[in-house]
């Protein structure tokens, strides 16, 4: 009697598991728990601990995240100093690269075993005017990885299959991780500047995680690149990335004059990836007449100030550029896979994330930190 009951229970459990994995279309053994970093309040302790493995919805894929880039946005999400509130508790991270291990029943564009990337934009409505025009990141219903949706600072994370990045097999997952946000973001910013080969572009914050990639994308687009930054090793990294002229803001006595002299009248475009409010406003002074200033970095509570008379007489433009859409992602990834862009990364363990945030706050990071989720 009891033996029969146990057999029936075991059969029912097996059927339940089979249905579950069939529903998820998974052929991988997926654990119930995983390691991740989570915080329960803004500015609170970053806890490296066991977390439940999420289950993908019908439109989602489950990615076994191998590596994730560490972005300034992750720092803002933890601090909670942006006007957009984060979900709490939260697992941060939005530059995750890994392998698809499960998918919902409605997913058609990914197969189990494919390489996939988690981006800042996790999902959008795909039916509003903005989404129809390719501005998915501006959708009022946008779901953001590592901000409103648990992100890639964990070993398993979900992503909307429509927005997830498709990564070619054989790609170095550690090196492509920063491309999924930093790379796409600066690539889109350079497209927004709409410059022509041979023209000058200034990258403000040229040796950081975004800036070091912006220098390379700009060079690959045929632009002449002036970099602005300050700190040990930053000029060397800038030159390694292909930059032409470096201005150290710590040493320059007249930034505007030095930049305009180096570029024969000022750069045709400026990409502001720095989080310095003063540097952003200064870019409106040194950009050449008819030039364009592109805002990318997001310092909390900051304003860009442009003196109206000069703004009008010089006929300059100020534009905001906010990440990129699916086409931008595909194009930015293609630059990387063809070897035109390389990620200057330092790999650390996921458990070391708090130390990475501390160095980021101090402005001591060259290139990009990438976390190994299994360390």
Curated annotation (Swiss-Prot):
Residues 1-27 form a transit peptide. Keywords: Metal-binding, Mitochondrion, NAD, Oxidoreductase, Transit peptide, Zinc. The keyword Ubl conjugation does not apply. SUPFAM superfamilies: GroES-like, NAD(P)-binding Rossmann-fold domains. NAD(+) binds at residues 205-211, 229, 234, 296-298, 368. SMART domains: PKS_ER. PROSITE patterns: ADH_ZINC. Its cofactor is Zn(2+). Zn(2+) 2 binds at residues 125, 128, 131, 139. It is an enzyme of class 1 (oxidoreductase). Transmembrane segments: none annotated. CDD domains: CAD3. PANTHER family: ALCOHOL DEHYDROGENASE 1-RELATED. Homotetramer. This is Alcohol dehydrogenase 4, mitochondrial.
């Amino acid at each position: 009697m009891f033996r029969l009951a146990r057999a029936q229970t075991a059969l029912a459990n097996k059927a339940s598991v089979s249905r579950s994995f069939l529903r998820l279309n998974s052929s991988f053994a997926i654990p119930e728990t995983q390691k991740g970093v989570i915080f329960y309040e803004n500015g609170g302790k970053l806890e490296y601990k066991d977390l439940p493995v999420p289950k993908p919805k019908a439109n989602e894929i489950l990615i076994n995240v191998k590596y994730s880039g560490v972005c300034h946005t992750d720092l803002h999400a933890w601090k909670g100093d942006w006007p957009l509130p984060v979900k709490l508790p939260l697992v941060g991270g939005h530059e995750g690269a890994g392998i698809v291990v499960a998918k919902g029943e409605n997913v058609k564009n990914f197969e189990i075993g494919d390489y996939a990337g988690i981006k800042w934009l996790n999902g959008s409505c795909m039916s509003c005017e903005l989404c129809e025009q390719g501005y998915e990141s501006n959708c009022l219903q946008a779901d953001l990885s590592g901000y409103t949706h648990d992100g890639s600072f964990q070993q398993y994370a979900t992503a909307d299959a429509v927005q997830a990045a498709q990564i070619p097999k054989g790609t170095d997952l550690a090196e492509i991780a920063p491309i999924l946000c930093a790379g796409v973001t600066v690539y889109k910013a350079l497209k927004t500047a709409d410059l022509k080969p041979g023209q000058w572009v200034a990258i403000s914050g040229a040796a950081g995680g975004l800036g070091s990639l912006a220098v390379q994308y700009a060079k690959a687009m045929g632009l002449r690149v002036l970099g602005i930054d300050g700190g040990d090793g930053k000029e060397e990294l800038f030159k390694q990335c292909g930059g032409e002229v470096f201005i150290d803001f710590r040493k320059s006595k007249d930034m505007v004059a030095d930049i305009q002299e180096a570029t024969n009248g000022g750069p045709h475009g400026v990409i502001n990836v720095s989080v310095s409010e003063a540097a952003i406003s200064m870019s409106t002074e040194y950009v050449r007449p008819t030039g364009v200033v592109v805002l990318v970095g997001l310092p909390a509570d900051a304003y860009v100030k442009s003196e109206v008379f000069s703004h009008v007489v010089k006929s300059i433009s100020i534009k905001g550029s906010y990440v990129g859409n699916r086409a931008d992602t595909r194009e930015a990834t293609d630059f990387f896979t063809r070897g035109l862009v390389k990620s200057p990364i330092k790999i650390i363990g996921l458990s070391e994330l708090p130390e990475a945030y501390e160095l980021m706050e101090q402005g001591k990071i060259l290139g990009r930190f990438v976390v190994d989720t299994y360390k």
